[in-house]
């Protein structure tokens, strides 16, 4: 985005668990091999659950790319203790510059945090909005339904892209406080006013009763019942990419640099 390569909740490990030999195991490989990554400029971590804060991956990224890492309040001490340097904590609605003209803001989410049975909610969970010349992108992390979607729209009224979770939502009596389901993800896009939404948090690790395939099937069924020509909600295949059209007057970063060189 705007010349920056940003990773959100990166996981290249085989399992998401306190130990490497048991726990949820991935159904499919990462969408890109670690060795094929471009230069990584920034890493965003939404919260400290094992499927979002993968310390082994964060260490590899720190060694290979040395990117700044941003997380919610209280996470820096843990990351530094476990060999992940260069992190910074942000509170909800706190903003920092990532590059000239590009700003990162931590935004609310309805979730919780824990790494053990004894540290629940001792660190902050959040979503992220990155704003730059090409527009604003929202990454929800994990979240249940709540008024924060409307609050985010009020502060960022022209979202171009929303990355919204659709998996780990059943059984609803247990999961609804922390995970939206596919139909709620569609409502979230509508509430946010995002032009495009891309589904995340599905199909890789089994963590709830909805399993590997149901979230996408439910999303497609819900979209078929409520077609909206003004918005599009996509569930990309593993490894598939999406290019957003340029805004009027917007140039690719390489074109902008070339023009500056001619100036």
Positions of predicted regions on the chain:
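Metallo-beta-lactamase
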Residues: 1-36, 71-141, 160-167, 218-240, 244-246, ...
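Catalytic core of the metallo-beta-lactamase
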Residues: 1-4, 98-160, 176-184
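Pre-active-site segment of Zn-dependent metallo-hydrolases
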Residues: 4-48, 56-60, 74, 114-120, ...
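Active-site metal-binding loops of divalent metal-dependent hydrolases
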Residues: 10-12, 48, 74, 109-111, ...
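Cap/insert and terminal regions of metallo-dependent hydrolase folds
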Residues: 26-28, 68-70, 74-77, 136, ...
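Histidine-centered catalytic micro-motifs
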Residues: 43-51, 199-203
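Short Gly/Ser/Thr- and charged-rich N-terminal loops/segments
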Residues: 254, 259
């Amino acid at each position: 985005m705007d010349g920056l390569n940003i990773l959100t909740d990166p996981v290249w490990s085989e399992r998401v668990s306190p130990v490497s030999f048991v726990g949820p195991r991935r159904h499919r490989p990462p969408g890109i091999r670690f060795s094929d990554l471009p230069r990584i400029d920034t890493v965003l971590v939404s919260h400290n659950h094992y499927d979002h804060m993968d310390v082994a991956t964060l260490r590899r990224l720190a060694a290979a790319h040395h990117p700044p890492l941003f997380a919610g309040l209280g996470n820096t001490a843990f990351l530094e203790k476990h060999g992940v340097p260069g992190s910074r904590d942000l509170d909800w609605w706190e903003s920092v510059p990532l590059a000239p003209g590009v700003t990162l803001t931590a935004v609310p989410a309805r979730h919780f945090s824990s790494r053990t049975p004894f540290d629940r909610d001792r660190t902050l969970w959040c979503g992220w909005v990155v704003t730059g010349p090409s527009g604003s992108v929202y990454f929800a992390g994990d979240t249940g339904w709540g008024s924060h979607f409307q609050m985010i729209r009020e502060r960022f009224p022209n979202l171009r892209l929303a990355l919204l979770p659709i998996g780990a939502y059943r059984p609803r009596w247990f999961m609804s406080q922390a995970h939206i389901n596919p139909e709620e993800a569609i409502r979230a896009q509508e509430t946010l006013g995002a032009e495009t939404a891309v589904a995340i948090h599905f199909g890789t690790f089994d963590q709830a009763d909805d399993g590997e395939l149901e979230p996408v099937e439910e999303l497609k069924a819900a979209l078929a019942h409520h077609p909206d020509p003004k918005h599009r909600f996509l569930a990309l295949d593993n490894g598939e990419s999406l290019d957003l059209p340029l805004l009027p007057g917007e140039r690719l970063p390489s074109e902008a640099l070339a023009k500056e060189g001619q100036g």
